[in-house]
Amino acid sequence: MSTGQEARRDEGDSRKEQEASLRDRAHLSQQRQLKQATQFLHKDSADLLPLDSLKRLGTSKDLQPHSVIQRRLVEGNQRRLQGESPLLQALIRGHDSSRTSATQVPALLVNCKCQDQMLRVAVDTGTQHNQISAGCLRRLGLGKRVPKAPGGDVAPEPPTQVEQLELELGQETVACSAQVVDVDSPEFCLGLQTLLSLKLATSLSASSLLPSALGIPTESICDSEALVPHSLLSLPKCTTKSLTEKDLQQMGSRLHPGCRGQSYLLPPLA
């Protein structure tokens, strides 16, 4: 009787040992599979990275392949959202258009002389003072020369404003001042202050600039658009009047076809 009980007890112990060994093997196998899966994910992510990003991985989590990929995906989404934003695109287009309009050449140019050199002077009443480009100032040799070192060479330095600048407009010599700007074109710009002091008038029918009783021919560089920008006709104490075909016939003026039907600023009638 005791021998049978001992045999059954031994059989139960051996069965428990087998079950324990099976559980241990299953646990080890599961850990091994998880480790292999993690290594496979890291290896698969590392294949997407360039070689220079794999040289210094170290132990930091930010430098691991999956962290680098996640960070690049977030940056790419931000760039894509910014690129698809209509507000941002409108701001970019507005900035580009303002930049191109700032460097746009005016419609009326006159030829004059300064320092025995020919200049192309732009007529623009949108600016109060005269303006001269830094490149034109260097070409005329009007830049101040200051020493770079106590015993060194001298180099031209453009001032912020030029006084007593003599311009030969037709048969008249005009002494005026001009502000120095970093714009290459136009070389020189006649502002509203000089135009009013000299009592200059712009004749659209004759395409000429009239100081006093002397006519100076101008050069028109616009094609099929408006002949004169709005700023050229914006004079103080003016009233707004819409020009029609009947008004043009009564005035006897010839206007470019692209300018008809638009509003311009005209001096008040007496």
Swiss-Prot record:
The keyword Cell wall biogenesis/degradation does not apply. Residues 1-33 are annotated as: Disordered. Keywords: Nucleus, Transcription, Transcription regulation. Residues 61-99 are annotated as: Interaction with NR1F2. InterPro entries: Peptidase_aspartic_dom_sf. Down-regulates transcriptional activation by nuclear receptors, such as NR1F2. Interacts with NR1F2, RARA and THRB in a ligand-dependent manner. This is Nuclear receptor-interacting protein 2. It comes from Mus musculus. The lineage of its organism: Eukaryota, Metazoa, Chordata, Craniata, Vertebrata.
